[in-house]
């Protein structure tokens, strides 16, 4: 949301565009991509699949996420906008890996 203010200058009136700080802080909501424990696929397969689907994950990150899901039932893969979150989750599902998304608080 923007507000236009007229200010007197030396020669003419000048239009100045001001943005409300609240409008700048209004960001799109983020979503968590969750990996669920998988008793079917091997740990190695899940680690490889995580790195293929989310290329910014290091091997160590992928292993940590896989172990978190294995030990706790669910692991946090990434927090991002809705569209990439849906893509990541669906890509994991297409590889036979259980995944879901939920809104980040």
Curated annotation (Swiss-Prot):
Q: Where are the transmembrane segments?
A: none
One GO biological process term is: protein catabolic process
Which top-level group of life is the source organism from?
Answer: Bacteria
Role of this protein: Involved in the modulation of the specificity of the ClpAP-mediated ATP-dependent protein degradation.
Its assembly, as annotated, is: Binds to the N-terminal domain of the chaperone ClpA.
Q: Which family does it belong to?
A: Belongs to the ClpS family.
Supply the name of the protein. ATP-dependent Clp protease adapter protein ClpS
What phylogenetic lineage does the species belong to? Answer: Bacteria, Bacillati, Cyanobacteriota, Cyanophyceae, Synechococcales
Q: Which gene encodes it?
A: clpS
């Amino acid at each position: 949301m923007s507000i236009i203010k007229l200010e007197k200058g030396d020669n003419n009136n000048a239009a100045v565009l001001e943005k409300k700080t609240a409008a700048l802080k209004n960001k799109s909501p983020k979503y968590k991509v969750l990996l669920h424990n998988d008793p079917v696929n091997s740990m190695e397969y899940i680690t490889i699949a995580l790195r293929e689907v989310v290329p910014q994950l290091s091997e160590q990150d992928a292993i940590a996420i896989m172990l978190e899901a294995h030990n706790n039932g669910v692991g946090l893969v990434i927090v991002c906008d809705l569209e990439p979150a849906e893509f990541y989750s669906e890509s994991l599902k297409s590889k036979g890996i259980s995944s879901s998304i939920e809104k980040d608080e």
